[in-house]
Amino acid sequence: MVIAMKKLDVTGDICPVPVLKTKKALEELNEGEELEVVGDYKPALENIKRFAENNGYTVVLAEETESRFRIVIKK
């Protein structure tokens, strides 16, 4: 089975914008689909992760490098 994945790039955005964009994108997904969010404002990673977990989504992956972050959330 192939899981559909939508991608969202929040590079250049600072909080609360990445969380708001993530919320909107997740609302547009069907149950079981995944959203990959990438960006460069590292505090957004924890904020997005917390938002997802507090709202019943599953965080599949959360990682960061020196200058970027990536999080995959399943609806």
From Swiss-Prot:
SUPFAM superfamilies: SirA-like. Pfam families: TusA. The active site is at C15. It comes from the Archaea. InterPro entries: TusA-like, TusA-like_sf. Belongs to the sulfur carrier protein TusA family. This is Putative sulfur carrier protein MJ0990.
